[in-house]
A protein has these predicted regions:
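Residues forming anionic-ligand binding surfaces in small-molecule and nucleic-acid pockets
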Residues: 1-3
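An exposure/low-complexity boundary signal
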Residues: 6-30, 234-239, 248-251, 256
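Conserved acetyl-CoA-binding loop-helix of GNAT-fold acetyltransferases
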Residues: 6-21, 191-206, 218
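A conserved beta-strand-loop-helix scaffold within acyl/acetyltransferase catalytic domains
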Residues: 18, 22-194, 274-284
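Active-site/acyl-donor-binding loops of N-acyltransferases
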Residues: 54-81, 85, 162, 211-284
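Feature representing long, continuous alpha-helical segments
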Residues: 119, 123, 198-206, 224
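Hydrophobic alpha-helix feature that most strongly marks membrane-spanning transmembrane helices
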Residues: 126-133, 149-152, 165, 171-172, ...
Length: 284
């Protein structure tokens, strides 16, 4: 949503979008389960009633791990300027990652190249996806191809090559406001040698600086690594509603009561006076 759209108007628009029927086996039926994914939560832990939605009493709030985000200072025009605001250990880490990944060749793939390499890209993605502790949906090659076709240059797919072999890729949505990391994939053995994943995080930061965005969203996993590079945690909730299924609704509320992960103590990447506002607000 545009930042000028109020919270009440956002809720009304979302609820209106759910007022539809689908055709199932030739008969119209109304979906019984709805989900609104990734809504920022500023409700303090002490005031949060697990499971009960702060958005609407008929909904359930389920909270997972926080998303790691970076607020960019508009004065930062290069990665060096970004790095200069970090603490000494984080600057050293950036240099180490750059050295470890120096043998890699990075190249943005065209739509035609995404289509041509779709099977390989998904195979690399599956190596990472298979190790994930929490899984909500999976990327298929048709999705990847469609996203590139629809978003064009705003969906850069970066290939990582070692000895002319594709060993990794990253992709995300890049707008004038934010960079949102979507999916990554890489050869696990090459990652150990060349720090592919950590290099990808740096490339997302570079994309944000080059585009002049306000925010970079790096996703939920690997909180410690991302915090050491300057990201801070932001709490997100998923709103769920189950119609005409009181037993399932009760079970979902029970699940929600145990889905309130505390944000762990993370590494401090910024000097005290330059600490990201995201890191401060996430402590509420």
């Amino acid at each position: 949503f545009d930042e000028n759209v109020s919270e009440l108007d956002r809720q009304a628009l979302i609820k209106e979008a759910f007022d539809f029927k689908v055709d199932k086996n030739g008969a119209n039926s109304i979906p019984r389960t709805f989900m609104v994914k990734d809504h920022y939560s500023d409700v303090p832990w002490s005031k949060r009633i697990s499971g009960k939605s702060f958005w609407d009493k008929k909904w359930i709030d389920i909270e997972f791990d926080p998303v790691m985000e970076i607020d960019l200072n508009p004065e930062w025009k290069t990665l060096d300027e970004y790095s200069s605001a970090l603490r000494k250990k984080s600057r050293a880490k950036l240099r180490r990652i750059d050295k470890d990944s120096s043998a890699l060749v990075l190249r943005e793939l065209s739509y035609e190249e995404v289509v041509e390499n779709a099977d390989k890209l998904i195979a690399l993605y599956s190596m990472v996806y298979g190790r994930a502790g929490f899984k909500l949906g999976m990327l298929y090659k048709e999705d990847l191809v469609f996203l590139k076709k629809y978003w064009k240059d705003d969906f850069p797919v970066i290939g990582y090559y070692f000895d002319n072999e594709l060993v990794g890729f990253q992709c995300g949505i890049v707008t004038d406001y934010s960079v949102e990391a979507f999916f990554v994939g890489f050869n696990l053995n090459e990652n150990k040698t060349h720090s592919i994943y950590q290099r990808m995080l740096i490339e997302f930061i570079k994309q944000g600086i080059a585009r002049g965005v306000m925010k970079i969203s790096l996703g939920r996993t690997a909180l410690d690594i991302k915090s050491s590079l300057g990201a801070g945690p932001k709490r997100l909730v998923c709103h769920m509603k189950v119609n005409n299924r009181p037993i399932i609704h009760s079970l979902m509320r029970a699940v929600a009561s145990s889905s309130s992960p505390k944000i762990p103590k993370l590494k401090r990447a910024w000097d005290d006076e330059l600490t990201s506002p995201l890191s401060i607000s996430s402590r509420s």
